[in-house]
């Protein structure tokens, strides 16, 4: 480090570690077809003030370490002058609000997107009686119900973040849908966030298949 270079306000070693963790998991999700056309964004808590997050507009199946950047919890770039996802505030609001949350994943699978369109009018998808509800932290039985919120899509992330915050004031949840867009899911770490994401995907698939079999909603 020369005399004109300010020290980084976060651990470069920790960022290196998280970049590789994110890239490995994101690549698997990309290969599953959940991140088409450079869509989706992913992050991991770096420390008490920063998160590592994917740079905007990058092919998620071909990420390299330079495609992971650092933002503070106001969503501002730290260290390198890169552009984070437009939806960065939807990640950082969770880290700011819940110190225990360590990872946020946002994907655009066909199932997630179709479900978000079908249930946009009601604003919620009710999942009930499924054994896989036990995949969500805090659930110990299939004899329970979970309501997955569906928010209207908007390009104003301040508005959407405020709507999410207002709902979090009333209920606990591990994810939500955005109409015509995709799914946000999170957890205490990457493993838990992946478990929640995959459980949502499976359960939404089941609900859509039931709709086809019943012929009505």
From Swiss-Prot:
CC per GO annotation: cytoplasm
Cofactor, free-text remark: Binds 1 zinc ion per subunit.
EC number: 4.2.1.109
Alphabetical list of InterPro entries matching this protein: Aldolase_II/adducin_N, Aldolase_II/adducin_N_sf, MethylthioRu-1-P_deHdtase_MtnB
Keyword field contains Chaperone: no
Swiss-Prot/TrEMBL keywords: Amino-acid biosynthesis, Lyase, Metal-binding, Methionine biosynthesis, Zinc
Disulfide bonds: none
Swiss-Prot/TrEMBL catalytic activity: 5-(methylsulfanyl)-D-ribulose 1-phosphate = 5-methylsulfanyl-2,3-dioxopentyl phosphate + H2O
GO BP terms in the entry: L-methionine salvage from methylthioadenosine; monosaccharide metabolic process
Residues that hold Zn(2+) according to the record: 106, 108
Domain of life: Bacteria
Keyword Metal-binding: yes
Pathway the protein takes part in: Amino-acid biosynthesis; L-methionine biosynthesis via salvage pathway; L-methionine from S-methyl-5-thio-alpha-D-ribose 1-phosphate: step 2/6
MF terms in GO: methylthioribulose 1-phosphate dehydratase activity; zinc ion binding
Cofactor(s) essential for the protein: Zn(2+)
Role this protein plays: Catalyzes the dehydration of methylthioribulose-1-phosphate (MTRu-1-P) into 2,3-diketo-5-methylthiopentyl-1-phosphate (DK-MTP-1-P).
Family (UniProt): Belongs to the aldolase class II family. MtnB subfamily.
UniProt protein name: Methylthioribulose-1-phosphate dehydratase
Organism (species): Xanthomonas axonopodis pv. citri (strain 306)
